[in-house]
């Protein structure tokens, strides 16, 4: 299935408003005779002060319609056009407004001439650092030291080495990709899809894309090093130190190599499970670290933490600013939110005001495959009694079919452990 995303919500022209309204109304209606929730395209509503955030603004009615769609269909997600990390964009040029590619991937400032232009650029190659493994390797090398500060310093040095190794890997992959014949992606290069292409060397286009250094398992890493995660002050302090190292190095690499290195909060749909299995094989079961089948996605608050939507936003918003290649914050809500859109609006606006660049809401989306009844369903449909239930859940920034069949074992467990934030 093609991975597609559509960013919309800021065009105030009659034609643009009609298209946005049609997209949202179609999302709410669903597809086919059973009115299924659409998996793709991933809808992303671009929130922007003066355009759609408050009553009286020209597209506020479309924002309200977007909230209705989110409550019923999980889409759209919300991109923050006022995000501080997108400084220098042109409010009159929609191609520079903050947008994402669905799962969370985003284009930062292009060092090679296009600035905050988003269209025609993409994530050329990513690599992910499995931080809990680094933390355990560091701890094993320091078994004779009881000094926590020494352990942390050793970990930071080790992480720094791995960030440099990640950079070298990306440079090698970038060179290999640039060696490809334009015919390997003929549509992309011959239809002006990729900006900057000179018609000869694909490097002319690819140099405007992102080389992303990602991460997984911040929460478990903190647990290994200091015995708590970033829901605590001590955990957050170390989390910021870790993320600052990622950002500092990526900024340095960007200047040195004149390529768009960026910090990426990796989706890790499969890696969350496979990396944990290898970790368990080597280190066994460690409470609050490997007593489950997955590592926590990037810098997220662990799914089992009992926090409110506002608390989760407060915590993660302190870290999202370190990422310039893509991140997401989402909250888990009860199905009943569809009857309280004012509450949903307050949550989305809170995330935007907290400078979260990309925000999503998870609500149960179960559908009877026999009669089409859609709601949170236990074992059998309350309308017709059928047990063939399609259960959609968000895997990263997008939906991926019934999570019982589309997700791996680790991601299935993560979904089942998710605590409702409201």
Regions found by a protein language model. Give the residues of each.
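Amphipathic, positively biased hydrophobic alpha-helical segments used for protein targeting
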Residues: 177, 225, 419-421
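Long, charge-rich boundary regions
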Residues: 383-422
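Contiguous, well-ordered alpha-helical segments that form the cores/surfaces of helical PPI scaffolds
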Residues: 211-224, 244, 394
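Conserved catalytic cores of very large enzyme subunits
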Residues: 1-207, 228, 232-394, 400
């Amino acid at each position: 299935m093609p991975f597609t995303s559509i960013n919309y919500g800021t065009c105030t022209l009659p034609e643009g408003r009609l298209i946005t309204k049609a997209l949202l109304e179609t999302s709410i209606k669903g597809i086919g005779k059973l009115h299924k929730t659409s998996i793709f395209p991933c809808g992303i509503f671009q929130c922007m002060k003066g355009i759609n955030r408050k009553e009286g603004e020209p597209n506020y009615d479309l924002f309200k319609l977007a909230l209705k769609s989110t409550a019923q269909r999980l889409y759209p997600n919300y991109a923050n056009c006022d995000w501080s990390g997108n400084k220098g964009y042109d409010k009159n040029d929609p191609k520079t407004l903050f947008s994402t590619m669905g799962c969370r991937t985003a284009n930062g400032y292009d060092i090679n001439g296009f600035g905050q232009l988003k269209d025609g650029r993409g994530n050329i190659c990513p690599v992910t650092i499995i931080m809990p493994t680094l933390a355990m390797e560091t701890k094993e090398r320091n078994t004779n030291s009881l000094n926590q500060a020494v352990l942390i310093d050793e970990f930071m040095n080790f992480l720094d080495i791995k960030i440099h190794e990640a950079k070298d890997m990306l440079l090698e992959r970038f060179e290999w990709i640039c060696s490809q014949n334009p015919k390997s992606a003929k549509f992309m290069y011959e239809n002006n899809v990729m900006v900057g292409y000179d018609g000869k060397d694909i490097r002319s286009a690819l140099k405007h894309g992102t080389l992303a250094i990602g991460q997984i398992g911040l929460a478990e890493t903190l647990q290994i090093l200091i015995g708590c995660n970033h829901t605590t002050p001590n955990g957050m302090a170390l989390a910021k130190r870790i993320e600052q190292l990622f950002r500092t190095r990526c900024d340095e690499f960007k200047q040195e190599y004149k390529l768009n290195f960026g910090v990426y909060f990796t989706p890790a749909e499969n890696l969350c499970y496979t990396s944990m299995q290898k970790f368990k094989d080597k280190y066994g079961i460690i409470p609050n670290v490997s007593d489950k089948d997955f590592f926590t996605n990037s810098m997220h608050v662990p799914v089992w933490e009992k926090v409110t939507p506002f608390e989760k936003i407060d915590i993660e918003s302190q870290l999202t600013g370190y990422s310039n290649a893509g991140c997401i914050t989402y909250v888990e809500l009860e199905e009943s939110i569809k009857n309280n859109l004012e509450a949903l609006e307050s949550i989305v606006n809170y995330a935007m005001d907290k400078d979260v660049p990309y925000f999503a809401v998870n609500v149960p989306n179960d559908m009877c495959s026999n009669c089409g009844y859609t709601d949170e369903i236990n074992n059998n449909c309350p309308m017709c009694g059928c047990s063939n239930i399609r259960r959609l859940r968000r895997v990263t920034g997008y939906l991926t079919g019934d999570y019982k069949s589309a997700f791996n074992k680790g991601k299935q467990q993560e979904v089942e452990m998710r605590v409702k934030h409201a």
